[in-house]
Amino acid sequence: IFTYAVITGRAEHNPVVDLAGALKSPKQKHFPHLLADQLGGFLRALNDYPGSVVTRNATRLLMLTGTRTIELRAAEWTEIDLEKGIWQIPSIRMKMRRPHVVPLSTQAKALFEEIHQITGRGRFVFPGRNDTGKTMSEASINQVIKRIGYDGKATGHGFRHTMSTILHEQGFNTAWIETQLAHADKNSIRGTYNHAQYLDGRREMLQWYADYMGALEKG
């Protein structure tokens, strides 16, 4: 508006220019995250975690799927199709309010199958310890991270950053990665189309990532 006013002679100066340096963009919050060369040690420590198998597997699944912690914690068994190797998260539970389909690697399927033996009769995949009618607490996964010695070095949300970094470095399709992380697509039609189009590619990508983590864990 001010630029137009200057051009048309309605103003002599654009005050917005003077504010350009004063207005700072909000800083993006960075969560502690693992580097590629730290993954092997972390996974070995996680494997030795003496606590709940369900919580340990939840931590691994967070790493293997790239989902947000809240999306994983509130997972219900009706969303998981182990035969097809697909986890369908309804839009109501997604940050972007769009349904999200997560292809499962063979390792992720095995973890869900192990958990099903423990919690499969209930509604939630990861029920609360004291109340199975509620989901696992928000602090559960970060408590696992703390107990295995990685407090301040890793977080549940940080696993998404680690996955994104490694997959980009390996040259995987950026659209596959962004779709898997359920990042926003400003074009809703394109976003819906891409979601279906990239399913096979994302399955291939997540299988590679699961195999990669397995190799690092073995050392």
Q: What residue ranges belong to the model's regions?
A:
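Hydrophobic, well-ordered secondary-structure elements that form the walls
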Residues: L104, F126, S164-L167, I177, ...
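C-terminal catalytic core of tyrosine-transesterase DNA break-rejoin enzymes
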Residues: R60-E71, A139-S140, R147, G158-A184
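Short, polar N-cap/turn motifs at the start of nucleic acid-interacting alpha helices
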Residues: T78-I86, D151-K153, F172-N194, A215-G219
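Catalytic-site neighborhood detector that most strongly recognizes the C-terminal catalytic loop/helix
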Residues: S25-P26, H33, Q88-R97, K109, ...
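Active-site/catalytic core of tyrosine-dependent DNA strand-transfer enzymes
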Residues: H33-G40, K84, R93, P103-K153, ...
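Non-catalytic DNA-binding core/recognition domains of DNA-processing enzymes
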Residues: I1-Y4, L19, L104
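Hydrophobic recognition helices of helix-based DNA-binding modules
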Residues: I1-A5, I115, L167, M213
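Basic, Lys/Arg- and aromatic-enriched nucleic-acid-binding interface segment
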Residues: I7-A75, E83, M94-R98, I118-T119, ...
